[in-house]
């Protein structure tokens, strides 16, 4: 069982990595003049972990889910006028595809992205989907780079793998 100091240190290091990644991702998205830098910020936070392998896995899940959700949203928008039931259908299809393709960890993200694309007021959905994907890739990329920085203090003997339960 871990001591309180170890748990606090783990939490601090994870918080520091997430904050740093989110800040850098947001600043880069603004520098690239992406329309919604907050998506880069969120992506960096959501995939950040103390273990590089886990950050990679979370990033791949998030990236696949974003792509699936964006594709579902765009394809549905192209086929049917977006209405409440179409948005629900997009969420259902995007999440189901994630489960079938073994990306269950990203299913909710796929549903969210599909809905956001279908609700892309004032923008063409292809453009909106492209920006969401770009912002997500940026955030995940920053998180992946930060995961390569060694931890401040090693907490276990295998720093590149999460503990097994």
Predicted regions and their residues:
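Alpha-helical transmembrane segments and their membrane-interface boundaries
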Residues: 1-165
């Amino acid at each position: 069982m871990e001591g309180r100091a170890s748990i606090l240190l783990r939490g601090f290091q994870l918080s520091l990595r997430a904050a740093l990644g989110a800040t850098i991702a947001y600043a880069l998205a603004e520098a690239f003049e992406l329309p919604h830098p907050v998506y880069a910020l969120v992506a960096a936070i959501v995939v950040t972990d103390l273990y590089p392998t886990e950050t990679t896995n979370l990033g791949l899940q998030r990236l696949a889910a974003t792509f699936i959700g964006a594709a579902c949203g765009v394809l549905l928008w192209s086929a049917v006028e977006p209405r409440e039931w179409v948005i629900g259908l997009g969420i259902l299809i995007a999440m189901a595809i994630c489960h079938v393709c073994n990306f269950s960890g990203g299913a909710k993200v796929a549903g969210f992205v599909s809905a956001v694309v279908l609700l892309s007021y004032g923008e063409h959905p292809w453009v909106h989907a492209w920006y969401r994907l770009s912002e997500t890739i940026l955030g995940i990329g920053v998180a992946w780079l930060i995961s390569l920085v060694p931890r401040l203090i090693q907490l276990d003997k295998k720093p590149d793998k999460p503990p097994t339960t």
